[in-house]
From Swiss-Prot:
Active site per UniProt: 204, 334
NCBIfam families associated with the record: eno (TIGR01060)
Annotated organism of origin: Frankia alni (strain DSM 45986 / CECT 9034 / ACN14a)
Role according to the record: Catalyzes the reversible conversion of 2-phosphoglycerate (2-PG) into phosphoenolpyruvate (PEP). It is essential for the degradation of carbohydrates via glycolysis.
Name recorded for this polypeptide: Enolase
Subcellular localization, as worded in the UniProt entry: Cytoplasm; Secreted; Cell surface
GO cellular component annotations of the record: cell surface; extracellular region; phosphopyruvate hydratase complex
Alphabetized UniProt keyword annotations: Cytoplasm, Glycolysis, Lyase, Magnesium, Metal-binding, Secreted
Domain of life, per lineage: Bacteria
Main location: cytoplasm
Top EC class, one word: lyase
């Protein structure tokens, strides 16, 4: 396998118009690998650190320091390493940074290099990325968790819950599930217009109307599902990303205009799960509310998927704590939360070995990079959330999954309802 010959980086823009890092790695045979790094809006306190410039340009969000770190510090340290030695490469990056949160060189610098090398190695091997990372058994297409209605930090409205998603679990293939999702998305726009509600979209492409309550959002989606002739529950299930850390302070939650304890908020979720076909709730409680998470998981963990995003931040150490204390039953996977591909794969493997599901995820600040689509198939996630079926930085990932399904042909298998605890064992 060719070794790394050159490493470059540049500042590009993400989908919110903020700078991010793009890295290019060239191998000695001329093979190129390119990767762009995403960025979140609602970020966990325990995520690896993005390196930003803090200067006047771009409101302090420039990434020239991270770009310089790639070119001046990381590049010279990895030249001549074999591109297939991913674990060695990533450990070299971690050691070079030398801080627990990757704050010296920046997780955005490290991740760009880590992913670009993997993509170069796949290309040099003559393999698609999903096959290079996942081996010959990688064939499971994930259920798309389509964020069609936005609130919280992703939209400037009075809706507390950050994401209302649909999961087309009854489809026979990924392509059919994506079609169903797109049809419901367009139907929802019609429903909103008919009621005189706004059809502007949030960061991830979902509509962002002002609504009296969070239940109103679920009812509107249910109407849209019915409008296209699909059955709520068996064809299309519902999912939430509450992002509750955003409204948590001093041990309580400010939700729908009132202050609630973890137990009271758990009562609310129990009511929702009883009233609607909800298969997944992400970050129902805050990243520091471990006791609340344990109690909620004991209460609802056999009925609905409880996903740790801010709780785990794709970090094997935090995930291990969750497994030991029986907090949550699924891991949200965001490559930029931890900063290297190897650590991401380790987190997913730890989750799967302990009976936790894993959901691959984008960030609200995205690019046209499609790495997470391949990664979802490579690690048998069975679930992916990468926004609405709108905005090209979201659709790029879904389109890549269509290509992968086509390439797999008869070997492709769609995760479907079995991906969620409410509908049986994992696929």
């Amino acid at each position: 396998m060719p070794s790394i010959e050159a490493v470059g980086a540049r500042e590009i823009l993400d989908s919110r118009g903020n700078p991010t890092v793009e890295v290019e790695v060239v191998l000695e045979d001329g093979t190129l690998g390119r990767a762009a790094v995403p960025s979140g809006a609602s970020t966990g306190a325990f995520e690896a650190v993005e390196l930003r410039d803090g200067e006047d340009r771009y409101g302090g969000k420039g990434v020239r320091k991270a770009v310089a770190a790639v070119i001046e510090r990381i590049g010279p340290a990895i030249i001549e390493l074999e591109a297939t030695e991913q674990r060695l490469l990533d450990q070299t990056l971690i050691d070079l940074d030398g801080t627990p949160g990757k704050s010296a060189l920046g997780a955005n610098a490290l991740l760009g290099v880590s992913l670009a090398v993997a993509k170069a190695a796949a290309a040099a091997s003559g393999l698609p990325l999903f096959r290079y990372l996942g081996g010959p058994s990688a064939h499971l297409l994930p259920v798309p968790m389509l964020n069609i209605l936005n609130g919280g930090a992703h939209a400037d409205t009075n809706v507390d819950i950050q994401e209302f998603m649909i999961a087309p679990i009854g489809a026979s293939s990924f392509s059919e599930s994506l079609r169903w999702g797109a049809e419901v998305y367009h139907a929802l726009k019609s429903v909103l217009k008919a009621r005189g509600l706004g059809t502007g979209v949030g960061d991830e492409g979902g509509f962002a109307p002002s609504l009296p309550t969070n239940r109103d959002a679920l009812d509107l989606i249910a109407e849209a599902v019915d409008k296209v002739g699909l059955r709520l529950g068996s064809d299309v299930a519902l999912a939430l990303d509450v992002a509750s850390t955003e409204f948590y302070a001093d041990g309580s939650y400010t939700f729908e205009g009132s202050t609630r304890t973890a137990e009271e908020l758990s009562d609310y979720y129990a009511e929702l799960v009883g009233a609607y076909p909800i298969v997944s709730i992400e970050d129902p409680l805050a990243e520091d509310d471990w006791s609340g998470w344990v109690a909620l998981t004991e209460r609802l963990g056999t009925k609905v998927q409880l996903v740790g995003d801010d709780l785990f931040v794709t970090n094997p150490e935090r995930l291990a704590r969750g497994i030991a204390s029986k907090a949550a039953n699924a891991l949200l996977v965001k490559v930029n939360q931890i900063g290297t591909l190897t650590e991401t794969l380790d987190a997913v493997n730890l989750a799967h070995r302990n009976g936790y599901r894993a959901m691959m995820s984008h960030r609200s600040g995205e690019t046209e990079d499609t790495t997470i689509a391949d990664l979802a198939v490579a690690v048998d996630c069975g679930q992916i959330k990468t926004g609405a079926p709108a905005r090209s930085e979201r659709v790029a990932k879904y389109n890549q999954l269509l290509r992968i399904e086509e390439e797999l042909d008869d070997a492709a298998r769609f995760a479907g309802a079995a991906a969620f605890p409410r509908h049986g064992q994992p696929a």
